[in-house]
């Protein structure tokens, strides 16, 4: 696949400086007419993975191959046009980055875009590309999608190949993606899931009452038509309570495990290299330790 330089206007500060490339995908494939960007946690061959940190790339070799999911998208015909800004080592939920700058929110100028997949969300909302690759450990696809008014999906953990993605908390890490339309979101999903999805599913749909109860009335009203359409695709629909002891306990457990795992992920790097960090990231790592 040929790699060439490509100039992209970046009014929303979504892109990593110097990452304006064009890697052409295969022809006559399901995604051949689509352009995409990737969050700068995914390896792209011959480009440093910066991960939102001034010292991460200098302590890691430049990758000589693409992340597995990037290769999958290129093989499906999509054209890669650059890498996007992330919260520092992906530890953030607002999209702020002291070193690379904070991407603008195209949907709401003057507000943060959400993180940590901030640049990927801004690039899609700002019409740089058709879709963007991102990651989600504790909300890093879902929050930016909400803030920027676009579609985003966090697949089931373990569903997609994460080889070539910088880990944060492995028991929660997933890849995900953004798009401006449901049709594009679906096209990408059919490629990444590597299976045909029938028009009607011979399975049961479980609707988590306790989870929906956490949403405000406006959110529940907005979701109702989509939930009704989704219900018609399944053989059986059942309402359940996911957490018998309450979702607050699940949330607290997830935060505790995630903090312990990201300390395991980064502690050796910190001890060896004493990297520069923003106050908020240093504080979070100190608490996790």
Predicted regions and their residues:
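Flexible, glycine/proline-enriched loop segments at strand-loop-helix junctions
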Residues: 57-59, 107-108, 172-179, 208-218
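Short glycine/serine-rich loop segments
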Residues: 74-189
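Acidic-leg catalytic submotif of subtilisin-like serine proteases
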Residues: 32-41, 72-76, 81-83
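Short, well-ordered alpha-helical
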Residues: 1-62, 66-67, 89-92
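Short, flexible, mixed-charge acidic loops at enzyme active sites
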Residues: 47-49, 90-99, 278-282
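Conserved active-site and cofactor/substrate-binding residues in soluble primary-metabolism enzymes
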Residues: 64-68, 118, 145-148, 180-190, ...
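Amidase signature
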Residues: 1-26, 30-31, 194-289
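Short, basic, glycine/proline-bearing loop/turn elements
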Residues: 51-57, 102-108, 287-289
């Amino acid at each position: 696949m040929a790699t060439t330089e490509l100039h992209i206007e970046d009014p929303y500060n979504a892109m990593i400086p110097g990452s304006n490339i064009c890697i052409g995908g295969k022809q006559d494939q399901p995604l051949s007419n689509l352009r995409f960007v990737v969050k700068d946690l995914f390896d792209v061959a011959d480009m440093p993975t910066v991960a939102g940190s001034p010292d991460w790339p200098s302590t890691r070799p430049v990758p000589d191959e693409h992340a597995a999911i990037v290769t999958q998208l290129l093989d499906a015909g999509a054209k890669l046009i650059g890498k996007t800004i992330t919260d520092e080592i992906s530890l953030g939920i607002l999209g702020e980055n002291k070193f690379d700058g904070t991407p603008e929110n195209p949907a709401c100028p003057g507000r943060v875009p959400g993180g940590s997949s901030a640049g990927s969300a801004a690039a899609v909302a700002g019409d740089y590309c058709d879709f963007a690759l991102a990651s989600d450990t504790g909300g890093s696809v879902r929050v930016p999608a909400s803030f920027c008014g676009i579609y985003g999906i966090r697949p089931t953990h373990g569903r997609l190949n994460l080889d070539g993605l910088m880990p944060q908390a492995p028991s929660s890490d997933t890849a995900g993606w953004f798009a401006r339309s449901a049709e594009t979101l679906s096209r990408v999903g059919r490629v990444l899931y590597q299976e045909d999805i029938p028009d009607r599913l011979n399975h049961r749909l479980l609707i988590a009452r306790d989870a929906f109860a956490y949403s405000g009335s406006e959110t529940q009203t907005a979701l109702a038509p989509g939930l009704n359409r989704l219900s018609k695709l399944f053989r059986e629909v059942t309402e359940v309570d996911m957490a018998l002891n309450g979702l607050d306990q699940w949330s607290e457990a997830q935060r505790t495990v995630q903090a312990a795992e990201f300390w395991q992920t980064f502690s050796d790097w910190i001890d060896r290299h004493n990297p520069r960090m923003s106050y908020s990231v240093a504080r979070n790592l100190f608490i996790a330790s």
